[in-house]
Amino acid sequence: MILKNISLLIILFFSISTFSAGHSLKNISITVVAPATGADNKTLSDLKNINGLNLQISSKCFAKGKLPFLASSDAVRFNCLRDALFDESDNIVWSLRGGYGSARIIPDLLKLSKPNTEKVFIGYSDITALHLFLSQEWGWKTIHGSNIADLLKPEQDQGNFTKLAEILKGKVKQVTIDNLVPLNDIAKSSDLVNGKLTGGNLTMVQTSIGTSWQIKTKGKILFLEDVNVAPFRLDRELLHLKQAGLFEDVKAIIFGSFGKDLDATMLVLRNFADSLDIPVFKTNRFGHEKINDPIIYNTNSKIIKSKEFKLVMGL
């Protein structure tokens, strides 16, 4: 009986949290896109049934292709994303989830002319590939933030969506990432760092190297996060970025969460920070863990020090 009551309380808490997050997004029209991995019918149905959400989810965009880890074929995923980005409505274009597949449709995106109207585009993880394309090729200010399916994850802080809603509704003039911890001496002595933001998922940033959509880091504040990365692999990926010249003329680096941030992971990050002559910071405020605060590509930003270091993004 006790276990049953606990289970009921957990379900009730999750339902209340999901309702609260959904309510914060009330009256915001959202077109859901799946440029990477898809979801089963139950997940899509559960999203549609969240009270207060105005989601447009086209069933044609979830017709399974030959590869089971993709939402649909490359052609279908591209067409659905293109239609959402070029739609003349003021709908927010919000990625369903990450997984894998976004990079596969970039060659087709490169053939398109920039739309007349800039859309608000949200997502993270594998969606980093699209952020790099949209921010670099079209000059858009896209938002690195929770995918819409994260509304259904009880382990996610639903405040992630409250903060996104405040941005979408124009309730805030700036966005902040708090609790930046300096990892090297040059970061500790920094008072002000200015620059526009780029970055995202480390695996996808590494994947971009040598492609037509390779990340452009010069003069930027670079933010990076990842999940399920063994410490030796993390060191290898960061070394690849360094040897590829991606840290040259970077204003600063901000590391988000890397899984549970084990002692070995932090050792890798601190050791790597010490090898660079640019400020390097660490925070747990964005990434694949519970908290995933929004970060805006291409916006004028600054790292400032008051009582602590924080990132401030203008809107």
Residue ranges of model-derived segments:
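Short Gly/Thr/Asp-enriched flexible loops that form oxyanion-binding sites at enzyme active sites
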Residues: G98-N116, L132-L134, L267
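Internal helical hairpin/lid segments
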Residues: W213-T265
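N-terminal signal peptide c-region/cleavage motif recognized by signal peptidases
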Residues: S15-S17
